[in-house]
UniProtKB/Swiss-Prot annotation:
GO terms for cellular component: contractile muscle fiber; myofibril; myosin II complex. Residues 16-26 have a biased composition (Pro residues). SMART domains: EFh. It comes from the Eukaryota. The keyword Cell inner membrane does not apply. GO terms for molecular function: calcium ion binding; structural constituent of muscle. InterPro entries: CALM/Myosin/TropC-like, EF-hand-dom_pair, EF_hand_dom. The gene is Myl1. Isoform MLC3 is acetylated at position 2. Non-regulatory myosin light chain required for proper formation and/or maintenance of myofibers, and thus appropriate muscle function. This is Myosin light chain 1/3, skeletal muscle isoform.
Length: 189
């Protein structure tokens, strides 16, 4: 018998390299609002009223306000933008820029127009419906303590002083708040 040939077994194939991790999903780019492309549709009288309100927030006499004041002026003029909407119309500035950078009325006006053009703002029925969720007994009231908690901890959180100022005089002797009357009150302020 012939001696067996020394047959070498093929070397075991190296394990396949692990697949490269999938790239992290790209964050959707925030659409920037091109304020220069916004057509001002306000009447001259409205613009004068807006300028008067704008100047009430000018603390230095320069006819300018800080970026952090823009939301306050917008709300004082009857719009109801979220803080996120305000930051978006401002171009998403840093917190440092919010307090340091100033704008003139001519820069503010397109921002006011952009916010006014946004038809996605809640109205009376939307707010009542949102509060109805907390009406455990279905009697048109919510507990003041629960509403305080919600306003201070959910969504755009309010400071405790802001919550107290908002709810002042709204609670009945049982600590309940008629939420339809409350919504009418806050929408008229």
């Amino acid at each position: 018998m012939a001696p067996k040939k020394d047959v070498k077994k093929p070397a075991a194939a190296a394990p396949a390299p692990a697949p490269a991790p999938a790239p992290a999903p790209a964050k959707p780019k925030e659409e920037k609002i091109d304020l220069s492309a916004i057509k001002i549709e306000f009447s001259k009288e409205q613009q004068e009223e807006f300028k008067e309100a704008f100047l009430l927030f000018d603390r230095t006499g320069e006819c300018k306000i800080t970026l952090s004041q823009v939301g306050d002026v917008l709300r004082a003029l009857g719009t109801n933008p979220t803080n996120a909407e305000v930051k978006k119309v401002l171009g998403n500035p840093s917190n440092e820029e919010m307090n340091a950078k100033k704008i003139e009325f001519e820069q503010f006006l397109p921002m006011m127009q952009a916010i006014s053009n946004n038809k996605d703002q809640g109205g009376y029925e939307d707010f009542v419906e949102g509060l109805r969720v907390f009406d455990k007994e279905g009697n048109g009231t919510v507990m003041g303590a629960e509403l305080r908690h919600v306003l201070a901890t959910l969504g755009e959180k309010m400071k405790e002083e802001e919550v107290e100022a908002l709810l002042a005089g709204q609670e009945d002797s049982n600590g309940c708040i008629n939420y339809e009357a409350f919504v009418k009150h806050i929408m008229s302020v």
